[in-house]
Structure formats: C-alpha cells, structure tokens
C-alpha cells in the first residue's frame, strides 16, 4: 500500500476510497458499545490528526488494539473515506495495524493526553514535542527559517557560515563563554599568576561566539550581499523568560548600503516572512490563537499593512518624558532604552512597529558608523509589540581612523582586530547590516512570550539538560 503523511491527506492529495498506509503515534483511543474503537493518530507532519475506525473483527483487536494508549507508535493500513462526522474531514477504515512501540507504563507516561503546563513540559523537553503546543511551534519555527532562506535567495544574497569559536569579542561585552581544554585542576600560569593561554588548544584565550558579524563583513566586502544563521552564546546571568544562554541569530551584511537601505530591507524581510507564514501555517496559528487567547491572525494582517515608524533616539526620549509615566527605569537623554521603554513606545504610544535610529555613541558598539555630529552613531533598533527589540543594526564604520578611535575609546586593542581593520585599508566601502534573534521573531509571530518554549532544548542559568 501507498504510505502517506497526514499532511498529504489534508492537502487533498490522496484519492478518497484508496488504500493507504500511515505511520504515527496514538493521541487517544476510545471504544464504542457497538464493537468499534476510534483511534486518533498523529504523525507531526501537520497540526491535524486523523481518526481511525477499528472493527472488533480485526485479528489483533482484543489482544492489541484495545490496549493502545497515548504515545504508542503504530503502522496502519486502511481505506481513506470521507467522515460522516463534522469534527474531521477524513477517516481511515482500518484493515491492518502493527504496533511498533508500546508505552511501558501508561499510568506514568510523562506526556499523557491531559493538558500540561509549559513549566512542566520544560522538565521533559525530550518528550514535549509530542504535544500540540510544542509541535505547532516546531513546525512554525521550521517554516519561518525556510521562508527566510527563500527570501534571501530571491534577493540574491549568499549564505556564509561563520565560526562558533572565536578569540574576538564582537559586542565589546564581558558576557562570553570561554572555550578551553586546560586541566582545571592544574591550570598553567604566567609569572604574574595570570592564566597562560598559550598552553591552551588554540594558543590564546577563546570563546563561544556572541555574533558572526565581523566575519560576515569580510564576505560582504567581496560578495556584496551575504547572511548567516546559527547559534550564538551569551553568558548573561539572567534567569528570565526573555533570555537564553544559547539562541539562534540571523545576521545580514550588505555592501554599498546605508542606514536607510537596511531599515527598508529589514522591514521588507519581516513582512515577506509574515505573509508566507499566514499562507502556509494557518492551522498551527489558529491553534495558537486559541491557546494564547489572542487575535494573532488579525495582528499579523495589520502588521503587513502598516509602515514602520522611523524616529530618532532623541525624539523617543522626549516622548517618554512627555508621557509623565513613572517608569521603573528613569528616563533621561543618554539612557539605554529598557524593555519597558521599548514596549511603551510600540504598545501604548504608536501601537505599531518602530525603528529607532541614531543612538548616542556611548550606548553602541565600536563598529557602528559615527555620525557627523560626532555624538551619535548610525544605528537602528527595530521594536515590535509584545516583544520589544527584534532587530539591531547599523551602518558599519568604514573609515579606519575613526574605527581606531572608537576601539581606543572602548578600551579594545586594535591589534586584536587587525584583520577587521584590513577591510578598511584595502578597498573600503560603505556597508551596513543587522542581527535578529530568531526566537524573538518566533515569539512575535506565535504570541508565546516565554522564549524557553520556542527553542527545542533551552540553555539557561543552571540548566543544560538534554
């Protein structure tokens, strides 16, 4: 018989009354008084499950079918028919079923058919993808990534892999994970008692990357338009639903562009993905609407119609001050906008996405282009409702003299960035780029606010299980 997926069935790709084979897991089973069992099967290929009708005349009905419980894996064959009920479009009249795997003790099965809290599901992350919630998120996550790759292919961008292990601190912050093979019980020391990293695997102090941007810029200065996508790491000791120690980042770099170019491009990218998602994942999104009790579809359709607000940092400060709201974090010129400031701006004041630009140079990294006023840099943050900052970007500093000044101001050694500085010495070019936290994008599209539920195996403070 022809093996098919449940998604194939619901795409109307399978002829009614044809004999098919489906492999999957039991969601639930119930018996009728008339000698039938109704088995709900899912295979993860789509949100929908399918009902299978098993007659008690089947040879293994009493020995096996009546003992099927949530989580059992099966391979079944039967006739695809139109359902006479209004809860589903199709059913399968069972001809044959083989149990591939039993649940050892149904009473203690961690993912029973009842609804579980997300807190509990994080404790059984190896099984939680079997639930409707995490399954829907996984499919949406996959399609968002697929859509992003398709967008960049369409826009003639090249994908470039960037290293996960690095000796550079891209963001100039201290929150990095060190990579070392040194014996922790016998660490080699220099005469001044500092660690002798020359004895380490890479011959110098090395870390897990916080960004692939600097490496990506090297390819932007030869291929013109490039992007990368991969895991990044922050050793930030923050145990909240907004932070992960390991998360996925999309980074984009483009030569011969300025701040306005990348602002327009980022907005176009987000709307392309949003439109594709509404077209391809509507069943999963409808489920999440009910789960979160929010109007996700209406919100995303509005997102497609509005133009993002573009506003200078100074104007944002004035809006916050004029609001007369007593924020937890004080508002004054020169502050780094906190999450509450960002969300007030997009959720209460404008109520649509906002691009904040031209930040004080003290708030931003060394590689951001210094504006003519010598006080601000050509940087942007794209803020969206319910999330806050989604994208951070800038026009990169292409002038080596000013780049060196910024490195000095921030206490960074220009010798460590010799190859990055070479880009400014050999055919320098105006270029710009941005980075986007992938899980934050998923959060915006799904309405799921805790970022730990948006990545298969969250890595957080005191948690590296699975």
Curated annotation (Swiss-Prot):
Keyword annotations: Aminoacyl-tRNA synthetase, ATP-binding, Cytoplasm, Ligase, Nucleotide-binding, Protein biosynthesis
Gene3D superfamilies linked to this entry: Bira Bifunctional Protein, Domain 2, Nucleic acid-binding proteins
EC number(s) on file: 6.1.1.22
GO molecular function: asparagine-tRNA ligase activity; ATP binding; nucleic acid binding
Reactions mediated catalytically: tRNA(Asn) + L-asparagine + ATP = L-asparaginyl-tRNA(Asn) + AMP + diphosphate + H(+)
GO biological process: asparaginyl-tRNA aminoacylation
PROSITE patterns: AA_TRNA_LIGASE_II
NCBIfam families in the cross-refs: asnS, PRK03932.1
Assembly description: Homodimer.
Family: Belongs to the class-II aminoacyl-tRNA synthetase family.
HAMAP family reported for this sequence: Asn_tRNA_synth (MF_00534)
Entry protein name: Asparagine--tRNA ligase
Organism: Buchnera aphidicola subsp. Acyrthosiphon pisum (strain APS) (Acyrthosiphon pisum symbiotic bacterium)
Gene: asnS
